[in-house]
Structures are given as structure tokens and as C-alpha cells.
From Swiss-Prot:
HAMAP family: PRAI (MF_00135). It comes from Acidithiobacillus ferrooxidans (strain ATCC 23270 / DSM 14882 / CIP 104768 / NCIMB 8455). This is N-(5'-phosphoribosyl)anthranilate isomerase. It comes from the Bacteria. The gene is trpF. SUPFAM superfamilies: Ribulose-phoshate binding barrel.
């Protein structure tokens, strides 16, 4: 099985960013969604991005943001990939000249082909648990199933932590996994030991 990539999301400070990279994360996520306890402004985000070493992908998470707000963030922050967590249209997602990931909110096995077709130019699709009234990551898991080969990288998120990620990977066989609350001490504050254990469990699959 190919190596499963790892993204640690909800980074809010330089210390956690460096620790995520040192643990072996392939990507880190910064949240630009004001209602999130992990939300950042551009000034803080720039400091975090500057602290990351080379070859760590910098992902910016947005939820139903206005196109002008996304563009303004991109002018100030050197993001590599955009992640859209709301009801964004394909035309909005592709309108910034950056690779993007579209999040799909799911509860169990479903046909992913319509989303693959609609967001055909997405770099990947991220599957997160659908929770009423919750945007930007629910922290809840859903019933994993064997993900189909649709010619598009599929990323697994939602309620993952060191104790269940190996099982999730064995069942779903995703391209990558995405974790936030599962490696935290409190919302927005990462537990460096949990991050290291999570990465070790993924690398051990």
C-alpha cells in the first residue's frame, strides 16, 4: 500500500507548527474561519507559515468565505493549497489559481462520483463527518468504508486519533488522513506527544 500522507490541521502557533513538521506531518492546516476556536488572522498566519521548514505543504481552510476575502488572504499568506469546507461552488473553488481540496460531509458509504465529476479539477476530496450546524471540522467520526478508486485522491478526516487511525486506514485505504482535535490538549493547542504518536501509527500501517 502506498504511504498515507498526513495533514495536521488547526495549527495556531509557531511552536505547534514546528512540532507538527518535526513529527513528520506532510502538511499543516491554518483555519481562516472566524467562528472556529482555531481561527487565525493574516498576521498570525504569516508568522506560522514562516516558521515551517521546506517541503511541508501549507493549507488554508475556508468556510463559505467571500471570494474577495479568500483573495485578500492569499495576497498576505503564502498558501500552497486551499481547502473549502462549506457549500462553495466548483467555480469559486477553482477561481484562485491554486490547487484546492473540497470537503464532503458524509455519514456513511455513499456514491462519491457526482462530487468527483463536479469538482473534477480538485487536487483531492476530503471526507468529514456531517454534523448539523458544524462547519470547519466536526471532530466526529463516521462509519468508514472501503473508498473506491475514482482517480482522485481521497482524504479521510473526522474523529481520528492515534488509537483509531490504523483501523481507519485499513478499512478505507485513503490517500491521506487529516487530524485536528485528535492531537490537541484544548481547541487550538496541540499536544506534541499526541502528534508524534499519531504520525507513528500512520507510518506503521
Amino acid at each position: 500500500m502506498p504511504m498515507v500522507r498526513i495533514k495536521i490541521c488547526g495549527i495556531t502557533n509557531t511552536e505547534d507548527a514546528r512540532a507538527a513538521a518535526a513529527a513528520g506531518a506532510d502538511a499543516v492546516g491554518l483555519v481562516f474561519y472566524r467562528s472556529s476556536p482555531r481561527a487565525l488572522d493574516a498576521v498570525r498566519a504569516r508568522k506560522i507559515l514562516a516558521a515551517l521548514p521546506p517541503f511541508v505543504t501549507r493549507v488554508g481552510l475556508f468556510v463559505n468565505a467571500e471570494a474577495a476575502d479568500v483573495a485578500a488572504t492569499l495576497q498576505q499568506c503564502p498558501l500552497d493549497v486551499l481547502q473549502f469546507h462549506g457549500d462553495e461552488s466548483p467555480s469559486l473553488c477553482r477561481g484562485f489559481g491554486r490547487p484546492y481540496i473540497k470537503v464532503l460531509r458524509v455519514t456513511a458509504a455513499q456514491d462519491l462520483r457526482p462530487a468527483v465529476d463536479a469538482y473534477h479539477d480538485a487536487q483531492g476530496l476530503l471526507l468529514d463527518c456531517a454534523a448539523p450546524g458544524v462547519w470547519g471540522g466536526s471532530g466526529r467520526s463516521f462509519d468508514w468504508w472501503r473508498l473506491p478508486d475514482l482517480g482522485k485522491p481521497l482524504i479521510l478526516a473526522g474523529g481520528l486519533h492515534a488509537e483509531n487511525v490504523a483501523e481507519a486506514i485499513a478499512i478505507a485505504r485513503p490517500y491521506a488522513v487529516d487530524v485536528s482535535s485528535g492531537v490537541e490538549l484544548s481547541p487550538g493547542r496541540k499536544d506534541h506527544d499526541k502528534m508524534a504518536r499519531f504520525v507513528a501509527r500512520v507510518r506503521g500501517t
